[in-house]
Amino acid sequence: MNESSHRITPMLEQYLSIKSNYPDTLLFYRMGDFYELFFEDAETAARELQIALTARNPRAENPVPMCGVPWHAADSYIHQLIQKGYKVALCEQTEDFRESKGLVQRKVTRVFTSATTTEETSLDPKTHTYLGAMYWDEEVNIGAFCWADVSTGLWTGIQVKKKSELWQWIQKILPKELLFPEKYELPATAKLIEIQFVPLPYKTHFEYPQAVKRLLQAQGVADLEALGLEKHTILVQACGALVAYLEQTQLQDVNHLMPFKPLDIGKYVILDEITEKNLELFKRVNGKKGVGTLIHVLDHTLTPMGGRLLEERLHHPWRDITTILENQSVLEWLILYKENMKKLQDALKAIYDLERLSTRIVLNRTSPKDLLALKNTLLILPRVKDALIVEINVKDNRYITIDESILSTMPTILRQLLTKWDNISDYAEKLDKALDENPPNSIVEGGLFKLGFNAELDELMDLLEHGESKLQALLEKEQKVNNLPRLKIGFNRVFGYYFELTKSAGTPPSHFVRRQTLANAERYTTEELKDLEERLLSATEKRNTLEYKLFQKLREELVSIRPRILFMASLIAQLDLWQSLADVAIRHNWNKPTLLTNNNIFIREGRHPVIESIIGKSVFVPNDLVMDETRRMLLITGPNMAGKSTVLRQTAIICLLAHMGSFVPATEAQIGICDRIFSRVGASDNLARGQSTFMVEMMETARILRQATSRSLVILDEIGRGTSTFDGLALAWAVAEDLVCKDHDGVRTLFATHYHELTALEEKLTGVHTMTIAIRHWNDELVFLYRLIPGPADRSYGIEVARLAGVPQSVIQRAKIILTQLEQTHQQPRSLLNLLPGVVQNANEELSKQDVKVVEHPVVTLLKEMNPETLTPLDALKSLVEWKLLYGTTHAT
């Protein structure tokens, strides 16, 4: 819309001037008790928020579109807009309109975006909300990606050497917003990722010298070595851009960010975004959260910090056996001391979100209720510790402090945690003495502090509460001292408080000063009345001013102890995660796995935790599984619906849980440490990217073949679909061969397939073992037993599965007839072993050693030797008969 066509008032001039600095935002412009929006912003906000669109000067030739929301309800409207991908700039009045001599001064105090919000109402308490920044240097072919949860201050990042790996991490973390240099060309598929991409100028955001300066200032350190970034130039540039963007949106220093630590990938089992999706760790395949996901089964956390730590641990399971065993030992201890765990759970339920509370305190966005929540949490801290160091005497229900000998039975990691415990009792007591139990919604409303916290504030509060009685007391005093029983006290807006004396009521004393003469009375004031009036009329404003001053002083003190608060938040999160995993183990009868340094996997009566939680333990059929150096690849055959995919997924999930330090859904499990877990399971077209099911499958398979090592675990389901039978079979064969022979030791692989020809690999390659899912026929019905047994399936049972799926009986009967005819009239394909010249240990090496020769059919050879010019019709006929016989003989072998 062209603003020049409208009559621009001084107020609108101010609006447009401010708006010009924030062109990509919706400007919430404070006017009294409302935030107003004008021009295109008003039209957009009215449409998105479903509020009335009006006009300023509606009778003008070109009225200015406008809409508004009440200031006290602005948070909910802003939340709606940022959830829809908009940015909102909040423009406040910076001076009191009563003191302003002209136009009230205003300025933007904050910019809201989807990744930078800190308001509790806009955040999922148990999920991180990340802001990301990426940078790729074409000259050195190195890229970096960093991500920060602005609401907690947690941030980290990585530096990589492949663009594909960079985008794998971006899709795994999935930040709400991703910052990138505006001249960088995003891949064509980027627009399909659920991320807001924010282009930024290179010079002002990513340039190295500025990035270093900005990063060091934000972190309060002298050099990059303090952050472990001295060798991560590209990562520094990404971090610098992230800090710059935060400064632009928060409009203040961003010193609330925790000390930066690059993510040490070597410490963790790597799960790419495809594996997380296929295993349904956080979302179901349809994209929905909740029931049907692994985190839904695991999440018995009782605090927001614990919930977010569970999310982190599921993203990044450990590789270090010592760390895993330490965490297992705590779960064992909690399961053994169930009463103590119950006390711990009761205490944790009262804990608020210390990380996000402390961030709002630092950013000066805290509310009185935030302070009350902090106080209540600090007062609970002793109970949390006592839950673990106090023994319950069941007989008489007494609590006894555990002596040193019993304390020594605690796992070392738990005992060390308790020795570092800080109740922050000094500030718990201070807040308890200071804060009223029923605080106002906003600090400007007053009533935050208790009586007795501050003498001056007490006096003001006493005035406000007892003002009428003080006026009455002064009246009674004057009546008595001056013998004026008919003296009255009153108030009006012009003269304020006054004494009123009728002409017949008596003579006014000398200290009475006349204020107003009426027909039958006089109104007076006194020094004492004026003093009381001044104190009464200014008490509310003075109280609010003093409370705000005391509030800010208290807030600054809390900022100084934020490291202590965050440290305790991390301990509480760890305790909460431990109790959650212990609780899951008790509820679902999970057992402690043994971690191995070799590549073996042994699972007895393993179960899929998500499916079991839905259908019930009594219904779910558990399975055993063994992988060792003679069984590096398990080729699993069987019909659809028999349970092949379930076995694959549950094996990967059991391995993942073991690396989290969790117990696992199995009677017994021995798990060799993994460096990566890969999952290529299920079919999915990506039509928006122009990728068929087959293309998606091959891309995922290619990633596995390039990145898997002998320490990895790979689960593959139905490689080679979506193309011709022989193409698919050849690809599946080659993939299996590559995985079995990789790095000489092979990759631990579970390979489910319908290509029964692949079972021949068991005879030729060491490490391949065939398995199938047991089925039975009962009264011409196919019964799935869901039990994994040795050997290949005898056939595919496709028609039987189709009947179970509800395909009409007429179609089923016709399919059976056609199948019988095909089996009778078509020669069976030769064994794949006979088709192939031999199984090669390394296809690439084999091809490099020899030329690939095409063996001609004998008929083709004879045809080439024939000379048509000398051939008689009779000879030609004889040749045709001979060739036909020869063709039939060769095709019968």
From Swiss-Prot:
One of the record's GO molecular function terms: ATP-dependent DNA damage sensor activity
Pfam families annotated for this entry?
MutS_I, MutS_II, MutS_III, MutS_IV, MutS_V
GO CC annotations? Answer: cytosol
Q: Spell out the Gene3D superfamilies in the cross-references.
A: 1.10.1420.10, DNA repair protein MutS, domain I, MutS, connector domain, P-loop containing nucleotide triphosphate hydrolases
Q: Which GO terms describe its biological process?
A: mismatch repair
Keywords of the record: ATP-binding, DNA damage, DNA repair, DNA-binding, Nucleotide-binding
Q: Which residues bind ATP?
A: 638-645
| HAMAP family assigned | MutS
Its recorded name reads DNA mismatch repair protein MutS
Species of origin reads Lawsonia intracellularis (strain PHE/MN1-00)
Point out the gene that encodes the protein.
Answer: mutS
